[in-house]
């Protein structure tokens, strides 16, 4: 925090009182409570957000490595982390996995590895088809939010189809 802002920030316990406006962030569920609690005050309430990547198969290795940074930073927990890929029909994931290998050391983090093992087991026990490189699973799924150590993907026929979908789902991304 910038030092000049210290005098403007107050931490309180209990019920908030004497404030003019609210900025809050949290899950979609938490946002419902914020909206109710702060209904009489001007507010900016941010809900869950997910980031997506639209691939067309012409990406360079360097671009895919950059995508890996966007997937793995903060273990995938940030709102700007890519949790969903849109790929053309018959997309070959070989180049994608080759680029992701640059982040293979992430599996050395115990909590990440536990999430990887758990989510992979849940997916396999549910008979989902997975692509796996021993530290990241990718699963075909229409959802935007994927669990830690996994990325969802969806095939597309045309970029216009993806553009339309992203416009329609703008409140989620």
List the predicted regions and their residue ranges.
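Long, low-complexity C-terminal extensions of enzymes
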Residues: 143-173
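Short acidic low-complexity segments
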Residues: 8-18, 140-141
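ALDH superfamily catalytic-core signature
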Residues: 3, 31-147
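N-terminal Rossmann-like or analogous alpha/beta NTP/dinucleotide-binding catalytic cores
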Residues: 21, 29
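Conserved small-residue-rich beta-alpha loop and adjacent elements
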Residues: 1, 26
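Structured loop/turn residues at beta-strand edges in well-structured enzyme cores
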Residues: 17, 80, 168
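Conserved acidic residues
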Residues: 20, 83, 171-172
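Short beta-strand segments
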Residues: 23-25, 45-46
């Amino acid at each position: 925090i910038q030092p000049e802002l210290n005098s403007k920030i107050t931490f309180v316990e209990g019920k908030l009182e004497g404030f003019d406006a609210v900025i809050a962030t949290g899950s979609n569920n938490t946002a419902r409570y914020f909206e109710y609690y702060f209904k009489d005050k001007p507010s900016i309430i941010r809900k869950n957000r997910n980031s997506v990547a639209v691939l067309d198969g012409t990406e360079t290795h360097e671009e895919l490595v950059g995508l890996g940074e966007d997937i793995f930073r903060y273990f995938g927990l940030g709102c700007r982390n890519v949790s969903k890929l849109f790929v053309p029909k018959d997309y070959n994931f070989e180049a994608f996995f080759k680029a992701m290998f640059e982040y293979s050391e992430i599996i050395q983090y115990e909590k990440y590895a536990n999430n990887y093992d758990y989510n992979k087991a849940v997916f396999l026990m549910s008979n989902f088809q997975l692509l796996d490189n021993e530290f990241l699973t990718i699963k075909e799924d229409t959802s935007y939010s994927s669990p830690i150590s996994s990325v969802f993907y969806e095939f597309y026929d045309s970029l216009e189809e993806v553009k339309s979908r992203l416009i329609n789902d703008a409140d989620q991304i």
